[in-house]
């Protein structure tokens, strides 16, 4: 296979057409235990990262928000309260299992009326141009086959002046933190995945996918190249996670 026909599934090179199927398999496998694993593997810190994303979103009453790779609905739940009855949140996820878990979780918690659930591929968003005031994608971009295509698709469906926020694991800024993080990711995380979700391989893929994801400056450059303005990023927890933001001109 030529490089044009291949992409990375973790550290493994696979056919471009095969990556989506294999990523889907990962999330079908972990969907039921996804929230528990998030809390365990981050010590609950993921809630702080997501709250910071909400605070920087600029979302207010009446806005229309797209939560891509929204999964089990943490961001959607908070945005639903902010936009109120005159606004709308679209929870989009390419994975049916994750979408079903998210829908059930939000309905059980009383979130209804202003939330729409859509199975959608971030590379080919099924929405008209200039639809959303804000788009978020949290811990999802690294799983997308063509990240440039996805970023361009997000730009298209944002309204002028709308904001994109990408929350993602990335490259730690301190060598000691990076070394400790590598040990945790490759030794501890798969073991926890096996114990809690009976699936070590999916969490091994998670660790590998993080290492293969573009670093902070590279992702910022990709957003610039797509046409976003005022791009910047905020490192959190020593650069283990970064929040990238950009505005559609």
UniProtKB/Swiss-Prot annotation:
The protein's GO terms of the molecular function aspect are:
2-methoxy-6-polyprenyl-1,4-benzoquinol methyltransferase activity; demethylmenaquinone methyltransferase activity
Record has Transferase as a keyword: yes
Q: Which reaction does it catalyse?
A: a 2-demethylmenaquinol + S-adenosyl-L-methionine = a menaquinol + S-adenosyl-L-homocysteine + H(+); a 2-methoxy-6-(all-trans-polyprenyl)benzene-1,4-diol + S-adenosyl-L-methionine = a 5-methoxy-2-methyl-3-(all-trans-polyprenyl)benzene-1,4-diol + S-adenosyl-L-homocysteine + H(+)
Which Pfam families does the protein's record reference?
Ubie_methyltran
- InterPro entries per record: SAM-dependent_MTases_sf, UbiE/COQ5_MeTrFase, UbiE/COQ5_MeTrFase_CS
Its pathway, per UniProt, is: Quinol/quinone metabolism; menaquinone biosynthesis; menaquinol from 1,4-dihydroxy-2-naphthoate: step 2/2; Cofactor biosynthesis; ubiquinone biosynthesis
Task: Could you list this entry's UniProt keywords, alphabetically sorted.
Answer: Menaquinone biosynthesis, Methyltransferase, S-adenosyl-L-methionine, Transferase, Ubiquinone biosynthesis
Listed binding positions for S-adenosyl-L-methionine are: 72, 93, 121-122
The text of the family note is: Belongs to the class I-like SAM-binding methyltransferase superfamily. MenG/UbiE family.
What's the protein called, per UniProt? Ubiquinone/menaquinone biosynthesis C-methyltransferase UbiE
Q: What is the organism of origin for this protein?
A: Saccharophagus degradans (strain 2-40 / ATCC 43961 / DSM 17024)
Q: What taxonomic lineage is listed for the species of origin? A: Bacteria, Pseudomonadati, Pseudomonadota, Gammaproteobacteria, Cellvibrionales
- Gene responsible for this protein: ubiE
């Amino acid at each position: 296979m030529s490089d044009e026909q291949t992409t990375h599934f973790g550290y493994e090179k696979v056919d471009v057409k095969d990556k989506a199927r294999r990523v889907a398999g990962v999330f079908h496998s972990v969907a039921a235990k996804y929230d528990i694993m998030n809390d365990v593997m981050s010590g609950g810190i993921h809630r702080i990262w997501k709250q910071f994303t909400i605070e920087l979103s600029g979302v207010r009453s009446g806005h229309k928000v797209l939560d891509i790779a929204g999964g089990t609905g943490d961001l959607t739940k908070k945005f639903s309260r902010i936009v109120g009855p005159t606004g709308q949140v679209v929870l989009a996820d390419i994975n049916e299992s994750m979408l079903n878990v998210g829908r059930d979780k939000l309905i059980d918690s009383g979130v209804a009326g202003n939330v729409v659930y859509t199975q959608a591929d971030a590379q080919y968003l099924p929405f008209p141009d200039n639809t959303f005031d804000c788009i978020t994608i949290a811990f999802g971009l690294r799983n997308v086959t063509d990240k440039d295509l996805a970023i361009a698709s997000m730009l298209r469906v944002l309204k002028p002046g709308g904001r994109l926020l990408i929350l993602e694991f990335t490259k730690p800024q301190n060598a000691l933190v990076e070394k400790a993080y590598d040990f945790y990711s490759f030794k501890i995380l798969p073991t926890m995945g096996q114990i809690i979700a009976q699936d070590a391989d999916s969490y091994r893929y998670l660790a590998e996918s993080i290492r293969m994801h573009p670093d902070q400056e590279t992702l910022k450059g990709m957003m610039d190249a797509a046409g976003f303005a005022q791009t910047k990023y905020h490192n959190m927890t020593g650069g283990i996670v970064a929040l990238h933001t950009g505005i559609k001109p």
